Swiss-Prot record:
Catalytic reaction list: N(6)-[(R)-dihydrolipoyl]-L-lysyl-[protein] + acetyl-CoA = N(6)-[(R)-S(8)-acetyldihydrolipoyl]-L-lysyl-[protein] + CoA
Residues forming the catalytic site: 377
Domain Peripheral subunit-binding (PSBD) residues, every copy: 128-165
Domain Lipoyl-binding per the UniProt entry, residue ranges: 2-78
Protein name: Dihydrolipoyllysine-residue acetyltransferase component of pyruvate dehydrogenase complex
One protein family per Pfam: 2-oxoacid_dh
EC number: 2.3.1.12
Similarity comment text for this entry: Belongs to the 2-oxoacid dehydrogenase family.
Quaternary structure note: Forms a 24-polypeptide structural core with octahedral symmetry.
Coiled coil: none
UniProt-listed PROSITE patterns: BIOTINYL_LIPOYL, LIPOYL, PSBD
Organism: Rickettsia typhi (strain ATCC VR-144 / Wilmington)
Gene name of the record: pdhC
Keyword Acyltransferase carried by entry: yes
TM stretches of this protein: none
């Protein structure tokens, strides 16, 4: 009897996914445990292994298919002696997804076309211009949507009409561009961050940290290792450990919002934002407060490599109670990050730069790092956030406290 290959559920919350690539073709022999396809989830690309032996008789869902429902039939394995007629009859009886996918895709494209038309009409109805500018435009037969306004908030004023000529009109439709389809990861990022910004009452607190002592200790530790970069401790490793220690001291910052209650977590699991080719992923350091700097650094390097290779497993990126996003390596001084819901906090880390500061009534040069905490005001108040940042600053400026 033919054997079903179903779209797997690679996480508890997964409802559908993209079938990114088939690694086997029709007619190939398949053994148990052999990787046959790659599935793109909301966070990573996962390998799918066959649990049975047979011949890949028919691929139902082609590669690069999007939004394939979990547990839908994606392919069929055949056993020895089964005919093409047997396979076709089996598919006809068991497959109801292929047609629905095509229908959904057609409807989606139609809806997108309608939406695009509506957006254009909506935009044209909201052209702001002064009454005099409108009269002049009508007299001169000038379309207001072709005029770039120079007034407040882009308002078209008299001078814009007087100085307008068709040669100055700017139309982006004539530009050359390349169109990159939004993959599943990018769509999920867009959806989650939009929901976070629209539904979570963000507030922001910033603090400056002197990292001179931290840099000295890091240099001393790294000198004891070989020249292999894989063994070196990074500044970000210290930041993760400092956050873990601060959350241990201020447990009320290690929380998330639920409709029925605020959840305070016993474990200190820290998500760390990692840039990948298709967007961003947040692998998790579990029980970060219980690990020393060497263990934490080693684990983080493994997670970063797996993230960039799209090899993270769901348990390695789902969950977490607090997120760190570090853009300091790009020279960014400070920034306000968007909360990674349902978490209640994300800390944006900026670059460390030499600055003049006052210490003991003397002006000295110190290496200062800016950090900005974005917090969910439903969960955490300003006092708790300030207490957390003060604790974090203490660990960063006195790094020996993290190592004992």
């Amino acid at each position: 009897m033919p054997i079903k290959i179903l779209m797997p559920a690679l996480s508890p919350t997964m409802k559908d996914g993209n079938l990114a690539r088939w690694l086997k073709k029709e007619g190939d022999k398949v053994n148990p445990g052999e990787v046959i396809a790659e599935i793109e989830t909301d966070k990573a690309t996962m390998e799918v292994e066959s649990v049975d032996e047979g011949i890949l008789a028919k691929i139902i869902i082609p590669q690069n298919s999007q939004n394939v429902p979990v547990n839908s039939l994606i392919a069929v394995l055949s056993e020895e002696g089964e005919s093409t007629a047997d396979i076709d009859a089996f598919i006809a009886k068991n497959n109801s997804v292929s047609l629905s996918l095509k229908t959904d895709t057609t409807l989606k494209k139609a809806n997108e076309s309608i939406t695009n038309v509506e957006v254009v009409k909506h935009d044209l109805s909201k052209i702001f211009a002064s009454p005099l500018a409108k009269r002049l435009a009508k007299i001169r037969n000038i379309r207001l949507e072709s005029v770039q306004g120079s007034g407040p908030h882009g308002r078209i004023v008299k001078q814009d009409i007087l100085s307008y000529s068709p040669s100055t009109a700017y139309n982006r439709d004539t530009e050359e561009y390349r169109s990159v389809p939004n993959n599943n990861i990018r769509q999920i990022i867009a959806k989650r961050l939009l929901e976070s910004k629209q539904t979570v009452p963000h507030f922001y607190l910033s603090i400056e940290c002197n990292v001179d002592k931290l840099l000295d200790i890091r240099e001393d530790i790294n000198k004891s290792f070989s020249e292999d970069k894989l063994t070196k401790i990074s500044v970000n490793d210290f930041i993760i450990l400092a956050v873990a220690k601060a959350l241990q001291e201020v447990p009320n910052a290690n929380a998330s919002w639920a409709e029925d209650a605020i959840r305070y977590y016993n474990n200190v699991d820290i998500s760390v934002a990692v840039a990948i080719e298709n967007g961003i992923v947040t692998p998790i350091i579990k029980d970060a407060n219980k690990k020393n700097i060497i263990e934490l650094s080693h684990e983080m390097k493994i997670l970063i490599k797996k993230a960039k290779d799209n090899k993270l497993t769901p348990v390695e990126f789902q969950g977490g109670g607090f997120t760190i996003s570090n853009l300091g390596m790009y020279g960014i001084k400070n920034f306000n990050a968007i909360i990674n819901t349902p978490q209640s906090c994300i800390m944006g880390v900026g670059a460390s730069t030499k600055r003049a500061i006052v210490k003991n009534d003397q002006i000295i040069i110190a290496t200062i790092m800016d950090v900005t905490l974005s917090a969910d005001h439903r969960v955490i108040d300003g006092a708790v956030s300030a207490e957390f940042l003060a604790s974090f600053k203490r660990f960063i400026e006195h790094p020996v406290l993290m190592l004992i």
